[in-house]
Regions:
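N-terminal mitochondrial targeting presequence
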Residues: 1-66, 72-110, 560
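Calcium-binding motifs, dominated by EF-hand helix-loop-helix domains
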Residues: 69, 188
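PP2C/PPM-type serine/threonine phosphatase catalytic core
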Residues: 79-184, 190-560
Length: 560
């Protein structure tokens, strides 16, 4: 573990031009060793330098601001020497008025407004949804929340129900029923722009439903044993992923090379940017949860074993250039190419090894026409071809699919973009949801017995899968020293996870600081965060309704 530490200095202005130091305390940012040479959490390449966070709170008559200084460190941990010194060209701005306040320090950085507690809460609650599902189909409630870092946010999501014919004629309660539900929950972690993730949120479910339709209308498939039917499901999901990506990339560029217009270049934006994809499908007929992952978003289930102990199990494996299985696959597909994986990235550039879009890792010509021959006014919309590109495609949208039977001990599923897992471990996530349940979904209807400590959670993920997952690395040393603290303030459980993620073990000052940093500066300290939590079970009502939990929902309409 390499720890980059600077100091946080709290200052106050007693009079114009007078600054008084009130106190100092450490503010730390930690990286695991494989992340110190590139931008933490970024799916695009860094500059080979890590940035340490140095802040000072500056008080004024009408505002409180946070001073951020970027110290560029070499891989050896020593201060680098840019042309103007390690910390240079520093100015102080009042961002509300966009005016120069003062030259607090010629060797510090821009001064940024530190949000009030009310403003922090407003930002955390700006994008959240929560619904109780009264369908007696195995899903009791789901919560979704987002916290942008990029502007606009590059993540997207989808929640949708597809009603399908029942193949057994009874529902979970043993009653006659001609229809069952497929619950779709998707998280799409975009990079290089929001265009690919937005397209996935609009179109992926319909592509999957189209491929699943023959299974429900084929008597042979309906009467097949569970193993055969599961294989048909997985094949249909994988086919839909590949078909959609083919339409996104090849379809767009085929139109572009045959008619190279600005309009066709703009319609190719979902092929130019990229997105990871995490899609979970819960089948109410047999309580089966299928998780398909393309990229490095992650799905977990949390539950209680017969002895009353909490457990977590990951249902997906991070597909990145740090995953030995993915590295082996790519090297076998491109034998003899030394640049296939460099610094943990595909062709030294892209962190996820599987993704939608990202045309430049998949083709350099189509129908015999090279993309480099496109007119200049069209190529200006495209991105540079990566170094070491010899035999594309290098990146695929083909998912890895897992199938899990949801039994009574399994309480909920958590899905999130990789930004959450940079800040929290799998065990911490389940412990935080379990703690939230004690207050907001108590089994006995009382909140009097809420314990003070987070529960102990065992990770039952297979060792091989666990070894392939990226571990939390941001602010780890501070979090470890905080003694397992947490914050419990949000009625939306997804927002609860997002609030705790940057808290470094329950520290409100970390939440305030990291939420206050605006885009694009914030991208150096946290990623876009998108979280979905679905609770398994059935509500006391069975009227087919979807009820908004208003205390946990901003002004959004349900998507199910």
């Amino acid at each position: 573990m390499m720890l980059l530490t600077r100091s946080e200095t709290i200052l106050a202005r007693n009079a114009p031009g007078v600054v008084k130091v009130l106190l100092s305390k450490p503010f730390q940012r930690a990286y695991s060793s494989f992340d110190t040479k590139r931008a933490a959490g970024s799916k695009v390449p860094g500059r080979g330098r890590s940035r340490a966070l140095n802040l000072a709170l500056v008080g004024g008559s009408s505002t409180v601001a946070v001073l951020l200084a970027y110290n560029f460190l070499s891989s050896g941990g020593q201060l680098a020497s840019p042309s103007r010194g390690p910390i240079s060209d520093i100015r102080s701005f009042h961002t509300q008025q966009n005016k120069l306040l003062s030259d607090v320090n010629r060797n510090s950085s821009d001064t940024l407004v530190l949000l009030s507690e009310e403003e922090v809460n407003r930002r955390l609650h700006a994008i959240q949804e929560s619904y109780t599902v009264n369908r007696a189909k195995g899903i009791l409630r789901y919560d979704v929340a987002q916290l942008p870092s990029n502007h606009p946010i590059e993540d997207n999501h989808i929640e949708q129900i597809v009603t399908v014919p029942s193949t057994r004629g009874v529902n979970l309660k043993g009653q006659e029923n001609e229809e069952e539900d497929l619950y779709f929950f998707g998280i799409f972690d975009g990079h290089g722009g929001p265009f690919t993730s937005a397209k996935l949120s609009r179109e992926l479910v319909s592509y999957v439903a189209k491929q699943l339709y023959p299974i429900y209308n084929d008597s042979v498939a309906n009467n097949s044993d569970e193993k055969v039917r599961s294989s048909l499901f997985s094949k249909a999901i994988a086919t839909s992923f590949l078909e959609l990506d083919k339409d996104i990339v090849q379809g767009a560029f085929r139109r572009l090379v045959h008619e190279p217009t600005r309009e066709n270049a703009l319609t190719a934006l979902p092929a130019i940017s990229g997105s990871c994809c995490l899609l979970s499908i819960f089948d109410s007929e047999d309580s089966t949860l299928r998780v398909a992952v393309t990229g490095d978003s992650r799905a977990l289930i949390g539950g209680v074993d017969p002895e009353g102990r909490w457990f977590v199990k990951a249902l997906s494996v991070d597909q990145t250039g740090d995953n030995p299985t993915e590295v082996k696959r790519l090297k076998s597909e491109h034998p003899g190419e030394k640049g296939v994986i460099r610094r943990g990235r595909v062709l030294g550039s892209l962190q996820p090894t599987r993704a939608f879009g990202d045309y430049r890792f998949k083709l350099d010509a189509i129908d015999g026409k090279k993309l480099s021959d496109l007119p200049n006014d069209v190529r200006m919309y495209l991105r540079n071809i990566p170094n070491y590109l010899l035999t594309p495609p290098y990146v695929t949208a083909e998912p890895v699919i897992t199938t899990t039977k949801i039994v009574p001990g399994i309480k909920f599923m958590v899905m999130a973009s990789d930004g959450l897992f940079e800040l929290l471990t799998n065990e911490e996530i389940v412990a935080l949801v379990a703690k939230w349940q004690e207050r907001y979904m108590p089994q006995n209807g009382s909140t009097e017995n809420v314990s003070k400590q987070l529960p102990i959670v065992r990770d039952i993920t297979s060792s091989s899968d666990a070894d392939s997952q990226r571990t939390d690395f941001r602010y780890k040393e501070v979090k470890d020293s905080s003694g397992g603290g947490y914050l419990l303030e949000d009625s939306n459980v997804a927002t609860h996870l997002i609030r705790n993620a940057p808290s470094a073990g329950g520290r409100k000052d970390y939440v305030t600081t990291l939420v206050s940093i605006p885009s694009p500066m914030s991208r150096n300290y946290r990623d876009d965060l998108t979280v979905t939590v679905a609770f398994f079970g059935n509500s006391t009502k069975d009227d087919g309704s979807l009820v908004v939990n208003h205390d946990a929902t901003s002004d959004h309409k349900p998507k199910l």
